[in-house]
Amino acid sequence: MKLPRLLQASNSKGVLAEKQALSYLQEQGLRLICQNYYCRFGEIDLIMIDQDTLVFIEVRYRKNSDFGGPFASINKSKQRKIITTAKHYLRTLEDEPFCRFDAIAIDSKSTTPAWIQNAFQE
C-alpha cells in the first residue's frame, strides 16, 4: 500500500528527527538499547542508558510553533501512553532499573536539539 504524499513527507521528517536526536544523545554519552519500541499501548521512540539509568525518550519535531512548540504536543494523555508503554517494556526485564522520561525537540530553525531530562514523571 502506498502512503499519501503528505504522510510520506511527514513520516520522513520524523525519521530524520529521530536520527538527529539519536546522534545528539549518543554524543552526550547515552547508549541505545531500543528504537521504536511498539506494543499495544503505544510506542517509545528511543530507549537508552544514561550511566545506570534507563531512559525512555520522546522525540518531537515541529516545523514551526504555530500550535505551540514541540514540547507542547506531549500532553498528559501522551505522557500516560508513554508511561504505560514503558511499564510494558519493563516487564520484559529481569530487574527493574532506575528510569526516567526525557523529551528531545528537533526544531527546523535550530541546529541543536533541545533536550529535557526528567520531562515528566508517573
Swiss-Prot record:
InterPro entries: Restrct_endonuc-II-like, tRNA_endonuc-like_dom_sf, UPF0102_YraN-like
Pfam family, one: UPF0102
GO MF: nucleic acid binding
SUPFAM superfamilies linked: Restriction endonuclease-like (SSF52980)
Domain of life: Bacteria
NCBIfam families for this protein: PRK12497.1-3, YraN family protein
Family (UniProt): Belongs to the UPF0102 family.
Name of protein: UPF0102 protein Ping_1176
Organism of provenance: Psychromonas ingrahamii (strain DSM 17664 / CCUG 51855 / 37)
